Design a protein with these regions (language model features):
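Loop-to-transmembrane helix boundary motifs in multi-pass membrane proteins
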Residues: 19-20, 57-60, 217, 229, ...
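Extracellular/periplasmic helix-exit of transmembrane alpha-helices
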Residues: 1-4, 145-149, 154, 174-203
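Membrane-helix boundary/coupling elements in multi-pass transport proteins
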Residues: 29-48, 177-184, 188, 217-245
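Flexible loop linkers connecting adjacent transmembrane helices
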Residues: 1-21, 46, 194-209, 309-314
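Hydrophobic alpha-helical segments and their helix-loop junctions in multi-pass secondary transporters
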Residues: 87-114, 126-145, 300-309, 334-342
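C-terminal membrane-solvent junction of multi-pass transporters and transport-like membrane proteins
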Residues: 82-85, 241, 255-260, 279, ...
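Helix-loop-helix module between adjacent transmembrane segments
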Residues: 20-40, 45-75, 130-131, 226-231
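Membrane-interface loop-to-helix entry segments
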Residues: 62-63, 71-101, 288-290, 294, ...
């Protein structure tokens, strides 16, 4: 969408949807961004507690201040380089952690492709779905692509950029999948495989030391810290993009609407952290909230990218459109199952 139309998802929603629908969608996306910021600030704060014994609330303030300074004093290009560095550290950390455990690949490989819904697991399943396919990122990706500002009237440039972004997206998804898989494999081998119950992140960190050595617990905390910081940065940027889109404007950290969006997401998330009694449950339920909003963003994006008015000749094919609608339907069905599990 960013390449073909020159608009990000939030701008396109405001431009092509009825105002009451556009505002409802974008305000719900802002709530999703707040949920993301809550989880990511919490994750960074928990990591600071693991490393330096800093209380959660004080650590949250430090993460918040650092992220605001990063966003308000750097261009996207600079932030992009920082994010790449952070993600590289996270990936290398979990590769090292995996080298310390023995993986039962005969069990792990089938589990990668075999879905299971154990009793009472829907909250965790949906929180993982929300954490992996974050709705705010769908807004941010189109904004990032749009910000490159190429000539959208030149078909050769558009086709070249579409091929590049397709490859870039696949590579990013593979890296994300690898890091998420590494975390799950580590938890399964170190804790589940040894019959060690874990209900808190701090507990996981403290148990890694006797199981895998002191280095393992420190590296786990470092990876968690960089994951929290990098994700809080992207969540803040997404909120700025979403809020600016309500006014049919692109993300620009120098613009008041973008700044209001960033601060709204981060400050409200911080305020919620101040009243959360159980940080681990706060992480779970905030990510579950993302999965609830996800179908709204999916259906919005599919509708807009399937419109010739928005995309011109680059709109989704009929096959792609209905495949994406089916995926959105599956996510919606999972949310219905989640609701039923609470009844």
């Amino acid at each position: 969408m960013g390449i073909a139309s020159g608009l990000c998802l939030s701008e396109a929603a405001s431009e092509y949807l009825k105002p009451r629908y556009a505002k409802g969608i974008l305000y719900s996306a802002m709530l999703a961004s707040i949920s993301t910021s809550l989880a990511e600030i919490l994750g960074g704060a928990i990591a600071l507690q693991m490393l330096f014994n800093i209380p959660i609330r004080a650590g949250s303030i430090l993460v918040l201040i650092f992220v605001v300074i990063m966003l308000f004093t750097n261009t996207y290009r600079v932030i992009e380089k920082w994010i790449i560095a952070f993600v590289s550290i996270i990936g290398l950390s979990f590769i090292y952690e995996l080298s310390l455990v023995e993986i039962d690949w005969n069990t792990a490989l089938p589990a990668w492709v075999t879905p299971a819904f154990p009793e009472g697991s829907m909250v965790v399943i949906m929180s993982v779905l929300g954490a992996v396919v974050m709705p705010h990122n769908l807004f941010l990706h189109s904004e990032v692509i749009q910000s490159r500002q190429w000539n959208i009237q030149d078909d050769k440039i558009i086709k070249k950029q579409l091929r590049y972004e397709y490859a870039d997206t696949i590579l990013s998804m593979v890296i994300g999948w690898a890091i998420n898989s590494a975390m799950i494999l580590l938890a399964a081998a170190a804790f589940f495989g040894t019959g060690t119950p874990v209900t808190e992140l701090e507990q996981a960190n403290s148990l890694l030391a006797p199981l895998l050595g002191n280095n393992a617990s420190v590296i786990f905390a470092v990876a968690l810290l960089f994951a929290g910081i990098s994700s809080t940065i992207t969540s803040g940027m997404a909120a700025g993009s979403i809020f600016a889109g309500i006014y049919k404007e692109p993300y620009d950290i120098k613009d008041s609407h973008s700044r209001i969006g960033v601060l709204t997401s981060l400050i409200l998330a911080f305020a919620l952290i101040m009243v959360v009694s159980n940080p681990f449950q706060g992480l779970i339920y905030s990510q579950m909230a993302l999965s609830v909003q996800l179908p709204i963003t999916i259906f919005t994006q599919v509708y807009l990218t399937s419109s010739s008015k928005v995309m011109g000749k680059y709109k989704n094919s009929t096959y792609t459109k209905w495949l994406l609608y089916v995926i959105g339907g599956i996510v919606t069905l999972l949310n219905v199952m989640l609701l039923i599990s609470f009844l």
